[in-house]
Amino acid sequence: MRPDALLTLPDYLPDHPDILFVGINPGSYSAQQGHYYARATNRFWWALNASGLVPVSLSPQEDWRLSQFALGLTDLVKRPTNSATHVRGDEFAAGRQMLAEKIARVQPLIVCFNGLTGYRQFFQERTQPGGQTRRVHGAWVFVLPSTSARNAAYSRDVILGYFRDLCALRDVLRHHRKCTEG
C-alpha cells in the first residue's frame, strides 16, 4: 500500500455547529496538503470569505478555525481520490451510515453538501442546489454547487450567490433558535 493511501483529512465537528459542510471525499491534493479544499482553484474559501459566513478571511491552512465560527467540516467518504468518480458504491454506502451518525451526534442547524453528488449519494435522490425541504436528524439541508474548478456549470458569482443564501438561512435559523430558547 502506498504511504499516501492512508492520508485523509480530519473531521472538524464542533458540538451544535450552525453549519456542517459535507464534501464528497477529499481530493488527493487536499489530503497531501492536510487541508480541506486546498487547491488554489477551488472556490470554497473564496466564496466562504465573500459570503459573510465568517467574520475574517480564512485560507485552506486555517480550516481548523472554522469551529471557532460554529462551522464544521467532514466528507461523505474519507478516502482521498483524484476524482470523486473513483469512489466505489460500497464506500458511499458505508459513508451514508457514518455521516448520519456524525449528524446525530453533533446536531448541526444545517447540513450543507458541497456538490449535488454528495446529496445524491446520501439521500439516494436527485435535487437542485439551494435549500431543501427534507431534514436529517432535525437539521435543515442545503446543497451548494460543487466548488471544484472542474465544475464549469456554475460560475464563481453563481456559487457566491448560493453561499449568500446559505448565510441568510443560517442567520434566520440562529434568530429562531435564540427566540425559542429564551
For the regions a language model picked out, list residue spans one by one.
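Short amphipathic alpha-helices and their capping/turn segments at secondary-structure boundaries
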Residues: 8-14, 57-66, 102
